[in-house]
C-alpha cells in the first residue's frame, strides 16, 4: 500500500545541488520558482525515487554538530540519503574520476553486512553509497 515517493532537503545553492545530484544519476523533472522570489522548489528523479530540494533566500546552514556522522547519528531527526549501487568500490572510484570527491572514499563493511561509504553534498548533507542487497 505505501511506497517511498520522495525525500525533501533544503539547499543553499540550487545550481550546485543540481550539478552534484546529476552526477549521482538524478535528473531534474520539475523546477518551480515563486514569482516573488520567496522559494524555489526543484524535483530530481532517479528511478522511482524523487529528491525534492527547497531553496529559501533566508535559509540557514546546517548546525555544526552535523559535521561528523558519528555525532549526527546521536541527534534525533533525518540523517542521510542512501543510494544503492552494485559495486561500492567501483562507485567510489567513479566519483573520484568525475570529480565529485577529492579523494576516494573509505569503504566500511557495515554492522548490517553491506559495504558502504559516505560523501557530503554541497550543503553538508550526508549521502550514503551502499551495496545492493
Predicted regions and their residues:
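Short hydrophobic/aromatic beta-strand micro-patches
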Residues: 8-10, 82-84
Amino acid at each position: 500500500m505505501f511506497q517511498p515517493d520522495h525525500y525533501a532537503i533544503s539547499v543553499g545553492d540550487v545550481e550546485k545541488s543540481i550539478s552534484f545530484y546529476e552526477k549521482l544519476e538524478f535528473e531534474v523533472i520539475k523546477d518551480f520558482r515563486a514569482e516573488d522570489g520567496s522559494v524555489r522548489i526543484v524535483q530530481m528523479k532517479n528511478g522511482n525515487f524523487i529528491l525534492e530540494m527547497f531553496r529559501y533566500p533566508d535559509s540557514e546552514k546546517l548546525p555544526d554538530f552535523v559535521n561528523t556522522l558519528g555525532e549526527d547519528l546521536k541527534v534525533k531527526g533525518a540523517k542521510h540519503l542512501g543510494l544503492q549501487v552494485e559495486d561500492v568500490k567501483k562507485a567510489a572510484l567513479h566519483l573520484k574520476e568525475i570529480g565529485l570527491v577529492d579523494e576516494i572514499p573509505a569503504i566500511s563493511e557495515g554492522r548490517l553486512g553491506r559495504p558502504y561509504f559516505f560523501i557530503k553534498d554541497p550543503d553538508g548533507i550526508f549521502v550514503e553509497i551502499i551495496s545492493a542487497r
